[in-house]
């Protein structure tokens, strides 16, 4: 039985490089390849120095190798991943997708990871989704017996300098995808997502506000306890994820459409592996992807785990 699952990283940009440092610390995953298309990429150069086999010949090179990875983490673009996904499937390689392609089911570790451990391809949704859907899920499960959460709204504020051209070009896709995740994974009957690119200098870390409508007679202590439990779960893979204060409960009012509301404020500070600490929005994506890969390795790839 191998001690670790073999891993390839497809993409050699900032997110892939940050992901590499997280994977190198894993007891369950062994990064062995980094695949890019630019021979001058800094990410490929760093990976080579760290002992990985690298190529600028793309996914076709990877799937042509006799020794193939157990898992691929892809951080390229939706267009590239949609073209690559069938190649991974044909080669028998499991894929963890950090792009908006959504070829496979979206996964948020505290909420639905166990449901998709056998999926050949899973998607990491969005940074806003990874940061806020766990809270919506926590509230939804606490009020499930009373009809659940009729409406949830999340506002994600990220440092403008941490948002690359892909994010800026796909704001509408971000809001649509995150809103859907608030409903299908978080459990709200209707969801809404807003992203704010904060231009502050020096940059501010990611901050998120999560509004959940709740039944007026809901057990508020149970809701707060559920939120704290889920926050603790996220902190096992994102130590910089934290509540800014206790969940705030408001009575029904005209402003809330006649519904009681619980409001939760969180912030996400990155680990600073490669990306700066203020880029918690990117860090939570690479950390959550690592968590998903580790759980897949533990549960379905027959590896024993262990230190290097």
From Swiss-Prot:
Pfam families: AcetDehyd-dimer (PF09290), Semialdhyde_dh (PF01118). CDD domains: ALDH_C. Gene3D superfamilies: Dihydrodipicolinate Reductase, domain 2, NAD(P)-binding Rossmann-like Domain. Keywords: Aromatic hydrocarbons catabolism, NAD, Oxidoreductase. The keyword Oxidoreductase applies. NAD(+) binds at residues 12-15, 162-170, 281. Belongs to the acetaldehyde dehydrogenase family. This is Acetaldehyde dehydrogenase 2.
